[in-house]
Amino acid sequence: MASLDSSPTALKLIAALRLPVTSHAHRVLRRYILGFRNTALKTICFQLEIQVNYPRSVRGAIAICAGALFLVAAALPAQQWKAPTSMKKLSNGLTVVVSEDHSAPTFGVCVSYGIGFRLEPEGRTGFAHLFEHLMFEGTPNAPKGVLDRVIEGGGGANNGDTRYDYTEYIETAPISALDPVLWIEADRMKTLDFSPKNLDNQRNVVEEEVRVNVLNQPYGLFFAIDLPGKAFDTYPNAHNFYGDFKDLDAAKIEDVKAFYEKYYTPGNAVMAIVGDVKPEEVFAKVEKYFGQIPSRSTPPKPKVDEPPQKAERRSSETDKLARVPGLAIGYRMPPHKSPDALAAAVTGELLHNGQASRLYQALVKDKQVALSVDGGVNWPLGTPFEYAGPTLMVSFIVYPPNVTEDQVLAAYDGAVKELAENGPTQQDLDRIVAKMRSDMYGNLEIPINRASALSHAVLFDGNFDSVYQIPEELSKVTAAQVKAFAAKYLVITNRTIINRTPAAAPAGGKEKGAGQ
């Protein structure tokens, strides 16, 4: 099957916009297609970007094109599928995964390091994300901007992401750029431009992100930041991953160097390369560029287990920017690779995925006590399969001001109870499993997304088998397993609730910024 970004359908859809290839709109759409991830947050960000930056005529065309592309992805056959994939470990500990995709003369690279929010030192909240930014500040050999010129000059794209259990750096470009990209990735694995100026610049950027995405946004990501802080008891799982300003301001160059030396080692990294390549040729190139990087001790994995939760946890917050109340509900989930993990993923999708989901139908359509429902396992910062420590099934519900929290919870509990007592219908189960599988296969058809998935799997499990096995294993999940999972995990004593309500405006004045 052709990858989505190079399929005739996708190319025709892009061409239909008739935008100059040098235009910003064209680049945004192409970047979105190349980096397509099946997550609600990516969709929301894309929609916001086109709403802000483009006139109505262009917005409509892009929206039609993007919607059609989603249909193309969802229509990919849900059948067992495995791409040719090989793996090798260098003498310095770097693990390399290569997967072939000859549908277009392009490649995707993902370098994932085994460091994320969860492992940040105490007193240095937000440091993993801050360091991700510093990785784009250049090195003595390749100053800031070189990476962008090499990749974007050929029509490619690059980015970085920090999550609970990994930080990844991704690039996609024409195959002619493979050697320069490998050289640059090796160069920044060897050293960085450690300067107070770079630290100050990126600290300011991260703090501005916090202001824009948290302090000055309705709800302030409370379902992603505040909820884990209430649901978990230990620092690795409960602290604010975006970072407290006092911790960010306290970061020193010595902290940056120590963090880099400890976590950005070859033995703590997995590089996956997917595209128009031959494994042995890629292994030789990686050995050429990365083989001389000295090995360093790999940091031990700390224990991040949580003590059992024995009672429901409930709290309330006020929000100066929200106009209607919001409710966040989190249930603790089974560990990664647990026998219950697949049933957890399916249950999360049955409850939250789309307007046919159990919660949308019960709360929005039938009882009319909610305006919107979203959520899932490991939501919103990951997939149900990519975590290496405690995580939650999250429900984020926005509800009308004339409805009470108890009314929302009564309808919510009724929907969950019905699933726990009766399980899903076979028709509902077949529908959601088919959608999950087609989404996963469609995702794997895009080289950069496959590279990302492969690198995460090897980082967590030591092999890439789960990338190709999970879609097939999903088809074996039964209604009885979903019913048993809901009865075991979706219980009141295993959940945490935060109710966030609009704050009253100050008397005689306008509301100030800051959503918390």
Predicted regions located by residue number:
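Histidine-acidic residue clusters that define the catalytic metal-binding segment
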Residues: Q79-K89, P228-A269, P279, K301-E306, ...
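M16 family metallopeptidases and their MPP-like homologs
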Residues: V97-S99, A104-E122, G126-L130, K144-M189, ...
